[in-house]
Amino acid sequence: MPYITDVYAREVLDSRGNPTIEVEIFTESGAFGSAIVPSGASTGEYEAVELRDGDKDRYLGKGVQKAVENVNDLIAPELIGIDVTRQNIIDALMIDLDGTENKGKLGANAILGVSMAAAHAAANYLEVPLYNYLGGFNAKTLPTPMMNILNGGEHADNNVDIQEFMIMPVGAPTFKEALRTGAEIFHALKKVLTSKGYNTAVGDEGGFAPNLGSNEEALQTIVEAIEAAGYKPGEEVKLAMDVAASEIYSDGKYNLKGEGVVRSSEEMVDWYEEMISKYPIISIEDGLDENDWDGFKILTDRLGDKVQLVGDDLFVTNTNKLSKGIDQGIGNSILIKVNQIGTLTETFEAIEMAKRAGYTAVISHRSGETEDVTIADIAVATNAGQIKTGAPSRTDRVAKYNQLLRIEDELAGMGEYGGLASFYNLANK
């Protein structure tokens, strides 16, 4: 039977060498599941709480022993004997046990580790792939990758203000070909950067992290790389940006230190409008500060039918935040990060709410990742159509892409690649 017999957590390391939590769940049937929780660098003000120990003498205060103890001593006893396939009951029990709005008592990292491990154990018990267990027979869409090939902001030690410059191979016929496209452009970009005398060290998410003359130069350089790799910018490959504007916002202004420029909300919108007129940009994430809702309304009214406007810090995978955005006509897409909310049940609720409102959903990694590939299965399970999981570089990023290759093979002719159809709410794409 699929009844839980043991839940065990341990402290492991993420891709930045910081501690995170791994959870294992054992069942009476012998079915087993495990998961490792990711961690972010640029975090939204309203994210669920990632519980850290704060002991400066151990891992610089970033240990997660308290979260581990919460799983082993508080959560585990409550889950023993519960059917592991009852995901909603498991998640609801942990939410009630925590009792706070932001999961600040037990920690979203503790709760999420258990939530994901339970799903893996249930899928193993039923002898089906995780994407099939979570999404049923209709889970078939391979996501368009949003590949971060130039890093800046909090993800790199350079002078580039914008956190991520990405490519999206929208014209590929399959995920396999999309990944090949992205990898070839990534290698072409290295050659372009080298020819210009730029450093080709990589940032947290596997993208290159050179010092550049301006943020626009990043866009120019990527277009050069796309063409050098033999692809057509705008037709086969489009661009995307994660501005992470909350990281450059203070005193009501946006301070782009790398360029020595300070802009108002409307001036930022003006700049985005100029950039999308010059470059094939199809998506802008967190273009303004998470609390600058007036600015976001201006951004949405002016550009919402032309580009995908993704809310990350803006919505933090939270249905209350998303509902407010939908009601006010703010943005047209939500970034989905499982550790922003803390359970799979709440994650899926956010995705469903977005779809019902005509918003797109982009499944995302965090800058601190591991070998865990759960988000790849979630992307297919929900038919989200888009996944953001870094450059085709660094094992913690490539692991997700390789899992999607496996899933595409398993689905055989039944799988569909998202491509340009992933942007179903854009009038001009």
Curated annotation (Swiss-Prot):
Enzyme class label: lyase
Localization recorded for this chain is: Cytoplasm; Secreted; Cell surface
Name one matching Pfam family: Enolase_C
Where, in this chain's numbering, is (2R)-2-phosphoglycerate bound? 163, 337, 366-367, 388
The record's annotation in PROSITE patterns points to: ENOLASE
The question of whether Cytoplasm is a record keyword is answered with yes
Which residues does UniProt mark as catalytic?
205 (proton donor), 337 (proton acceptor)
MF GO annotations? magnesium ion binding; phosphopyruvate hydratase activity
Task: Kindly tell me the pathway this chain contributes to.
Answer: Carbohydrate degradation; glycolysis; pyruvate from D-glyceraldehyde 3-phosphate: step 4/5
Q: What does this protein do?
A: Catalyzes the reversible conversion of 2-phosphoglycerate (2-PG) into phosphoenolpyruvate (PEP). It is essential for the degradation of carbohydrates via glycolysis.
| CDD domains on file | enolase
Q: How is the cofactor bound?
A: Binds a second Mg(2+) ion via substrate during catalysis.
UniProt keyword annotation of Transmembrane present: no
According to its UniProt entry, this protein's organism is Oceanobacillus iheyensis (strain DSM 14371 / CIP 107618 / JCM 11309 / KCTC 3954 / HTE831)
List positions binding Mg(2+). 242, 285, 312
Please report which protein family the annotation says this sequence is part of: Belongs to the enolase family.
Q: What is its EC number?
A: 4.2.1.11
List required co-factors: Mg(2+)
Q: Which GO terms describe its biological process?
A: glycolytic process
Q: Can you supply one Gene Ontology CC term for this chain's record?
A: phosphopyruvate hydratase complex
Chief site of localization:
cytoplasm
Keywords for this entry?
Cytoplasm, Glycolysis, Lyase, Magnesium, Metal-binding, Secreted
Q: What is this protein called?
A: Enolase
Q: Which reaction does it catalyse?
A: (2R)-2-phosphoglycerate = phosphoenolpyruvate + H2O
Question: SUPFAM superfamilies from the xrefs?
Answer: Enolase C-terminal domain-like, Enolase N-terminal domain-like
